[in-house]
UniProtKB/Swiss-Prot annotation:
It comes from Human herpesvirus 6B (strain Z29). This is Protein B7.
Length: 75
């Protein structure tokens, strides 16, 4: 179950990163992809990755919120 949830959240985060990369300035995409690269280095244990996924999703959410505040449109 956890593996499926992790895959789902991971997939959503990557789609958001790609969207940010396409729509936003490079500053947003660099920050987002740096977080993704960190994720890929974590050993695949349920505790380690579950904790990181929460932090990762939080960072992506913050990037999206920051972009919207600065006038970017998503969708």
């Amino acid at each position: 179950m956890l593996h499926n949830v992790s895959k789902c959240i991971h997939s959503i985060c990557i789609r958001v990163c790609i969207k940010l990369h396409v729509i936003c300035s490079s500053r947003f995409s660099i920050r987002c992809f740096a977080v993704y690269e960190t994720y890929s280095l974590i050993p695949n244990t349920s505790d380690g990755r579950q904790a990181f996924l929460y932090a990762f999703y939080g960072k992506v959410h913050a990037l999206v919120a920051d972009a919207i505040r600065k006038g970017f449109r998503f969708g």
